[in-house]
């Protein structure tokens, strides 16, 4: 789904997953932490069975995954020159779309360095977005496949047709567009990672993995979920969204190529598989699919949110059972990806000297795992705030300047919105498969302005209250009882947090 924390043939995990956020798990790792589990084979992947194609089993599916093929943009980068020992206005740490968007927005008139170990690397992730979200940001030229609408399979008898265009992001076009603007705005690049930050009253020092120290008045951490620069002072207890996806050539698939499959909660593929069926009944997974043609499709099995998160092996086993049931025969796999997204949990210390944005600043939608459009839209807000304070003659100290930027990033209306989303996550965490189906049956019956706004983080507390009441009124009697039984304590916690949180 719409996520930033996706890895291509890489997953560095120690279970339970709540330990995950203590590590920079997007760092390249040649092997998974479990040496006995084979995520992918280095054998040739055009493997055939008696009918010519794979009738999928877990091992056969993974044997089809090719070796990693890293793609890079081809152009000259203006590099940061450490010999000049200048104090820069801003250092942006990170290499994902958000880091690049911030660098793009902050160039021009300011001295900016982007610290990224692989600045030319094309992101390997599959990003899906609602078309209207990218239209609002003038990024329609960065979409490479569009569907006129989406479909939700609640169960084998009930479907929801969503009249909202959906698209896959063209990763190369998006990065190329951002990089060109960075270069034209005078942004410099330093190919390294930051291992430590030290602060004085007027500036900060970033010590990089290559031994270079970079001085900057403001440090912006856009490294995802590493939590290596931004500090937290509360126990880290998020839920986790976990998914496994493949971009594959198939003999055929049963889906309409004019619609993407937003959620498929059907479980008939688990009939006769007692243990797997029982696990799915307790902590369900759904299929997310983007059909590009009748024989090329992106398929992803996803656990919406769980605490602790499901193991990747479990996700893959469920996916294999689903593909076999749907009669999807895989001819070859272009790429695969693994996704682990911390959702909810506490915000970082606000304010603090390093300014965080994106995953490291708690900006993932706690109920959905969505982040791409929300954070890309936030980048210019943060950029304008930083520019405003840097060019003013107020004489702010480094701490005061960062505090003002944090305030603009997390104003009280955004904090209240996030509290409501965390309330939603806490309810979803307690729902089994049948409860989850009942919830989304009601959710997608809401007026489009409500479910559009909720998924895209466009509703604030004055709109979220009537949204919640409308959802409750659309829910079945059983669903209402579940919400009251399982949502009472989360509701009390939310109200308490809202009362205590004041500007």
From Swiss-Prot:
Catalytic activity: a carotenoid psi-end group = a carotenoid beta-end derivative
Top-rank taxon, per record: Eukaryota
One Gene Ontology cellular component annotation held by this UniProt entry: chloroplast membrane
One of the Pfam families matching this protein, by short name: Lycopene_cycl
Annotated localization: Plastid, Chloroplast; Plastid, Chromoplast; Plastid, Chromoplast membrane; Plastid, Chloroplast membrane
Gene Ontology molecular function: intramolecular oxidoreductase activity; oxidoreductase activity, acting on paired donors, with incorporation or reduction of molecular oxygen
Principal location class: plastid
Record protein name field: Lycopene beta cyclase, chloroplastic/chromoplastic
Species: Narcissus pseudonarcissus (Daffodil)
The encoding gene: LCY1
């Amino acid at each position: 789904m719409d996520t930033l924390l996706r890895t291509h043939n890489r997953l560095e995990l120690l279970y339970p997953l709540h330990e995950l956020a203590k590590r920079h798990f997007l760092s390249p790792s040649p092997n998974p932490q479990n040496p006995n589990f084979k995520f992918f084979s280095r054998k040739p992947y055009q493997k055939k069975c008696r009918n010519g194609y794979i009738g999928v089993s877990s091992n056969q599916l993974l044997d089809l995954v090719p070796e990693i093929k890293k793609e890079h943009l081809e152009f000259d980068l203006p590099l940061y020159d450490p010999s000049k020992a200048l104090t820069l206005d801003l250092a942006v740490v990170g290499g994902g779309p958000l880091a690049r968007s911030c660098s793009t927005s902050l160039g021009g008139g300011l001295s900016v360095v982007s610290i990224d170990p692989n600045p030319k690397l094309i992101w390997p992730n599959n990003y899906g977005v609602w078309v209207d979200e990218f239209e609002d940001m003038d990024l329609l030229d960065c979409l490479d496949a569009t569907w006129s609408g989406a479909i939700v399979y609640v169960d084998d008898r009930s479907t929801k047709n969503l009249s909202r265009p959906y698209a896959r992001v063209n990763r190369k076009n998006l990065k190329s567009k951002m990089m060109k603007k960075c270069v034209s705005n005078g942004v410099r690049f330093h190919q390294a990672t930051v291992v430590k930050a030290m602060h004085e009253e007027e500036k900060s020092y970033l010590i990089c993995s290559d031994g270079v120290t970079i001085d900057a008045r403001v440090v912006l951490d856009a490294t995802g979920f590493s939590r290596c620069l931004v500090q937290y002072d509360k126990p880290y207890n998020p839920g986790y969204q976990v998914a496994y996806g493949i971009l594959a050539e198939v003999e055929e698939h049963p889906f309409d190529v004019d619609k993407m499959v937003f959620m498929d909660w059907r479980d008939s593929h688990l009939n006769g598989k007692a243990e797997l069926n029982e696990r799915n009944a307790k902590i369900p997974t759904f299929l997310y699919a983007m059909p590009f043609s009748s024989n090329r499709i992106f398929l992803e099995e996803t656990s919406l949110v769980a605490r602790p998160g499901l193991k990747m092996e479990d996700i893959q086993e469920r996916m294999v059972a689903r593909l076999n049931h749907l009669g999807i025969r895989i001819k070859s796999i272009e790429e695969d990806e693994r996704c682990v997204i911390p959702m909810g949990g506490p915000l970082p210390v606000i304010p603090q000297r390093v300014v965080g944005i994106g995953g490291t600043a708690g900006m993932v939608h706690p109920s959905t795992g969505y982040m791409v459009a929300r954070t890309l839209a936030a980048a210019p807000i943060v950029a304008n705030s930083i520019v405003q304070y840097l060019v003013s003659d107020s004489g702010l100290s480094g701490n005061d300047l960062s505090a003002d930027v944090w305030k603009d990033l997390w104003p009280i209306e955004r904090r209240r919105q996030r509290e409501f989303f965390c309330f939603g996550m806490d309810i979803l965490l307690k729902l089994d498969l049948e409860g989850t189906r009942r919830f989304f049956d009601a959710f997608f019956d809401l007026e489009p302005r409500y479910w559009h706004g909720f998924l895209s983080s466009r509703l604030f507390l004055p709109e979220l209250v009537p949204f919640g009441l409308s959802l409750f009124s659309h829910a079945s009697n059983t669903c209402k009882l579940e919400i009251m039984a399982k949502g009472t304590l989360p509701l009390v916690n939310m109200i308490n947090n809202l009362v205590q949180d004041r500007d």
